[in-house]
């Protein structure tokens, strides 16, 4: 950048002392130092931001590569599962049907002309239908206790009457 040695800096200081004088030199030196420090901080911030952008760009490319690899793995797994499911359906249909080999030649899957259910539909138990509104509306008791939430609301007068000692209670009159 600039080749400033000790001798050149001393020469600049002497010239500044002669030109500015001893009264204004400290103030100008402070201002110059502050401006120089500000410029250094700005340059360091720009360098840091550029390096951050370079790292972010590298991370983005790594992210896209990773997502692509994950998609490829997912697709191969799904293809293998579909192939094994087709084999299982074919074996199931051949074992269930009385003809044996005639069902193995038929197309498999939900569009099968034989109307035979697949192994997956037979094995799956019908799901119980529940009222989801009731399930979502219920707050667990442990949560109510932990948050000190009242389960039964009582008026102030009823609470005072409930906790008043028997000696201070008024006798109840009937008729």
Swiss-Prot record:
Part of the twin-arginine translocation (Tat) system that transports large folded proteins containing a characteristic twin-arginine motif in their signal peptide across membranes. Together with TatC, TatB is part of a receptor directly interacting with Tat signal peptides. TatB may form an oligomeric binding site that transiently accommodates folded Tat precursor proteins before their translocation. One of its GO terms (molecular function) is protein transmembrane transporter activity. GO terms for biological process: protein transport by the Tat complex. It comes from the Bacteria. The keyword rRNA-binding does not apply. It comes from Burkholderia pseudomallei (strain 1710b). Belongs to the TatB family. The Tat system comprises two distinct complexes: a TatABC complex, containing multiple copies of TatA, TatB and TatC subunits, and a separate TatA complex, containing only TatA subunits. Substrates initially bind to the TatABC complex, which probably triggers association of the separate TatA complex to form the active translocon. It is found in: Cell inner membrane. This is Sec-independent protein translocase protein TatB. Gene3D superfamilies: 1.20.5.3310. The keyword Lipoprotein does not apply. Residues 160-175 have a biased composition (Basic residues). Residues 96-119, 152-175 are annotated as: Disordered. InterPro entries: TatA/B/E, TatB.
């Amino acid at each position: 950048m600039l080749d400033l040695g000790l001798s050149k800096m001393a020469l600049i200081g002497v010239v500044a002392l002669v030109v500015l004088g001893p009264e204004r030199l400290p103030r100008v030196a402070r201002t110059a130092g502050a401006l120089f420090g500000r410029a250094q901080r700005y340059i360091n911030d720009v360098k840091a931001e550029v390096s951050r952008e370079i790292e972010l760009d590298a991370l983005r490319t790594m992210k896209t590569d990773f997502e692509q690899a994950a998609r490829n793995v997912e697709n191969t797994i799904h293809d293998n599962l579909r192939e094994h499911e087709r084999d299982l359906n074919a074996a199931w249909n051949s074992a269930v049907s009385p003809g044996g080999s005639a069902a193995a030649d038929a197309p498999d899957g939900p569009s099968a002309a034989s109307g035979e259910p697949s192994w997956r539909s037979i094995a799956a138990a019908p799901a119980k239908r529940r009222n989801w509104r009731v399930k979502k509306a219920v707050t667990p008791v442990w949560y109510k206790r932990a948050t000190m939430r009242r389960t039964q609301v009582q008026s102030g007068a009823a609470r005072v009457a409930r906790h008043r000692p028997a000696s201070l209670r008024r006798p109840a009159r009937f008729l």
